[in-house]
């Protein structure tokens, strides 16, 4: 049976010990290292090149959600299983959209964690069975479609508009001309079929086009 190297990222000793004990009967899941904050993840990934990363979202030093896209880009073959206390479905959606392969609640049984590991190990997606999988996948697909409406640059401009930047401020921030900023603004309004900035922002929030 193929051996899978696992890097465990969690700052709670009881969680670390619990996972290690749960995997003792399954030697093909080998925990090669565990670290306790987000800042240590990169060095550990470079050193051990894990097949699976078990990641908590609440970490000292850096938010687990923030590092998922970077890890996914740097190590695309590494599967990321988020192991968290957050039960909100919107967090599941954001986590999977960021590039995680699985989402498991810490309140779930060891059998659920094992099932999740077995699933993500073969490059499939796993969602904790206590969550509404169909609703999450529907929202995830809708988010993907919505994001494709706007270009990356348009989303950057949109975020700065939401933060209160003027056209001049956006042009300086993104190193583009004011004319280009105005063009992006008009294109976004046309795509979302709105006529005012307030309508643009309200529509963008409803469609989850603005990241926080």
Curated annotation (Swiss-Prot):
GO molecular function: DNA-binding transcription activator activity; DNA-binding transcription repressor activity; phosphorelay response regulator activity; sequence-specific DNA binding; sequence-specific DNA binding, bending; transcription cis-regulatory region binding
CC terms in the record's Gene Ontology section: cytoplasm
Keywords: Activator, Cytoplasm, Disulfide bond, DNA-binding, Phosphoprotein, S-nitrosylation, Transcription, Transcription regulation, Two-component regulatory system, Virulence
Any single GO BP term: positive regulation of single-species biofilm formation
Residue ranges constituting the HTH luxR-type domain according to the UniProt record: 143-208
CDD domains, per the entry: LuxR_C_like, REC_NarL-like
Region Required for prevention of DNA binding in absence of phosphorylation and for full stimulation of activity by acidic pH, residue ranges: 1-138
4-aspartylphosphate modifications at: 56
Subcellular location, record wording: Cytoplasm
Keyword Nucleotide-binding: no
Induction comment from the UniProt entry of this chain: Induced about 3-fold in acidic pH compared to in neutral pH.
Post-translational modification, as annotated: SsrB phosphorylated on Asp-56 activates the expression of virulence genes whereas the unphosphorylated form controls biofilm formation. Independently of SsrA, can be phosphorylated by small inorganic phosphate donors (such as acetyl phosphate or phosphoramidate).
Outcome of substituting residue 186 to A: Strongly decreases activity
S-nitrosocysteine: modified positions: 203
Free-text disruption phenotype from the record: Decreases expression of genes encoding virulence proteins. Down-regulated targets are involved in transport, secretion, and trafficking of cellular components in addition to protein and membrane modification. Increases expression of invasion protein invF following invasion of macrophages. Regulation of gene expression is abnormal in conditions of acidic pH, during phosphate starvation and in low magnesium. Decreases survival in macrophages. Decreases level of biofilm formation and abolishes expression of csgD; simultaneous knockout of hns suppresses the effect.
Top-rank taxon, per record: Bacteria
Annotated phenotype, changing residue 34 to A: Does not affect its activation by acidic pH
Domain Response regulatory per the UniProt entry, residue ranges: 5-121
Ranges of the DNA-binding region feature: 167-186
SUPFAM superfamilies linked: C-terminal effector domain of the bipartite response regulators, CheY-like
Subunit structure comment from the entry: Homodimer; disulfide-linked; dimerizes upon DNA-binding.
Miscellaneous notes: C-terminal tagging with photoactivatable mCherry abolishes the increase in activity seen at acidic pH, N-terminal tagging leads to slightly higher activity at acidic pH.
Protein name stated in the entry: Response regulator SsrB
Organism in which the protein naturally occurs: Salmonella typhimurium (strain LT2 / SGSC1412 / ATCC 700720)
């Amino acid at each position: 049976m193929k051996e899978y190297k696992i890097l465990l990222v969690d700052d709670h000793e009881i969680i670390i010990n619990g996972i290690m004990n749960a995997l003792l009967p399954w030697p093909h899941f080998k925990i090669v290292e565990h670290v306790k904050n987000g800042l240590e993840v990169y060095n550990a990934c470079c050193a051990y090149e894990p097949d699976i990363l078990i990641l908590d979202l609440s970490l000292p030093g850096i938010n687990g959600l923030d590092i998922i896209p970077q890890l996914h880009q740097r190590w695309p073959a590494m599967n990321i299983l988020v192991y968290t206390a957050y039960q909100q479905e919107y967090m599941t959606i954001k986590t999977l959209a960021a590039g995680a392969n699985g989402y498991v609640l810490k309140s779930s049984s060891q059998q659920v964690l094992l099932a999740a590991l077995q699933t993500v190990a073969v490059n499939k997606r796993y969602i904790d069975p206590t969550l509404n999988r169909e609703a999450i996948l529907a929202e995830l697909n809708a988010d993907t479609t919505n994001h494709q409406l706007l270009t990356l640059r348009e989303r950057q401009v949109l975020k700065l508009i939401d933060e209160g930047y003027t056209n001049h401020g956006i042009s300086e921030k993104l190193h583009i001309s004011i004319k280009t900023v105005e063009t992006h603004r008009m294109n976004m309004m046309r795509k979302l079929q709105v006529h005012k900035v307030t309508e643009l922002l309200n529509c963008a929030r409803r469609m989850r086009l603005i990241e926080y």
